[in-house]
Amino acid sequence: MSEKKDILERLSSLLIERKNYTEDNSYTNQLYSAGNAKILKKIEEEASELIEAGSEERVIKKEIVHEAADLWFHTMVLLAFNEINPLEILN
């Protein structure tokens, strides 16, 4: 579990860095600039895409993994935007 916590901590740190480095024109910074509502909208979109991928008559594991990763990423962006450490969820 420690290795997984390390990955969460590293990703969280990177997302916070991006938030604080406003000159970066990355996708992540574009989300931060657009604000909380835009980030929530992306989470809604990604959740819908994950549900759709999992609901297909012929479920394709690769698509579910891809959509789940997108949902996790945008959720991590929301946490960083609101200064919430993901380890709070694990506790």
Task: Give residue spans per PLM region.
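Flexible "arm" and connector segments at domain edges
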Residues: 1-68, 72-91
